Every structure is written in C-alpha cells, then in structure tokens.
Amino acid sequence: IKDLLKQFEFNVSILPGNHDDLEMMRKICDDQITLKSVECVNKPFAVFNFDTHVQDNVRGYLNIKEIKNLENYLSENKSTVIIFTHHPIIKVGSEWIDNNITENNNVLIQLMLKYHDTSFHIFSGHVHQSFYKRINNIEFHTTPSTCYQFKVKSQKFCVDKILSNGYRVIALR
C-alpha cells in the first residue's frame, strides 16, 4: 500500500476503520502519508479528517479534541466545511448497521447546527453502501465499499448480490 500511495505527488491522509490494524498502518506513515487528523484549510472550503477508529470495537467515537479544533475554526471562518470519517455520523436505515455508527455523534451534529450559516458535507465509509441525507445545513454521504456492498435498508446482515464494488469521487473546486 505504501508503494501505491507514494506514487501520488501530494500528501495522503489515511483514516483507520474498525477492521484496520493501527500498528501496521503506522508503519507506512511518514512525511507524505499520515494517520493524524489534519485540517486542510483552503478557502472557499476547509477539509477536516476525523479519526473515529476505536481499537477492537465496531462502533466509532469522535475525538473531543478534534471537535474543539473544528469549533475553533468555525468561530473565525464561514467557509464550507468538508469532514471525512470512517464511521457514519447518522443512521442509514439498515437496523443492523445503525447499531454501529459513531457513538457520540450528537456532539458534532449540535455543533454543526449551531453554525447554521455554514454548509457542511460529511463523507463516511463503514456501511458498504451509498447513502445521502440532508438535515438543515448538513449533507451526509456514505461511500460504497471497494469490495462488496450491503443491501440497503436491511434489518439483518445481507450482502447485495447485484451491486459490485464501488467508490466515490469527490471533486473540490
């Protein structure tokens, strides 16, 4: 993986998920590849990466320090904010998956609603399906998995046998 990421001529931030071995991921990190939560602030938007990984736990958790960094940024800036997480912040409508979203999601949601004049776009993985929902000034997206997809709105574990692997392209302009 490190060799593949080194082909890029820009810095890469990787976000660990619940299946990742954090120690192994740290071995590929250097000046170009980082696990750190980085803020790429470049008007007219700002990009924040939140590490929701909790070792040996399927559910995610937001780091309060990262939330405070976002709050500090919002107190001084009005640009669009893009946030990347592994675990989704809201439920996606599949009962068995919805039990494993970010535990302290309300902290982030309340902060974003407080800054109602700011547009937020949150992109998450974990759920192996594409999902979109808008709540006031916040757009929530989940990204399909690069392997198999889970059936949308299923009450129990179910692989979608029709959809193949996927990904999401996000163009920042």
Where are these regions (language model features)?
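Short, electropositive alpha-helical surface patch
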Residues: 1-11, 100-110, 135-146
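Core catalytic region of metal-dependent phosphoesterases/phosphodiesterases
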Residues: 1-37, 114
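Active-site neighborhood of phospho(di)ester-bond hydrolases with catalytic His/Asp-centered motifs
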Residues: 12-18, 50-51, 82-85, 116, ...
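Active-site environment of divalent metal-dependent phosphoester hydrolases
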Residues: 18-25, 55-58, 88-93, 118, ...
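Acidic/histidine-rich helix-loop elements
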Residues: 21-32, 55-64, 151-161
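Binuclear metal-dependent hydrolase catalytic cores centered on His/Asp/Glu-rich metal-binding motifs
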Residues: 42-80, 97-107
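Active-site-proximal segments of metal-dependent phosphoesterases and phosphodiesterases across multiple
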Residues: 61, 79-120, 149-151
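Binuclear metal-dependent phosphoesterase catalytic core
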Residues: 68, 75, 110-115, 130-173
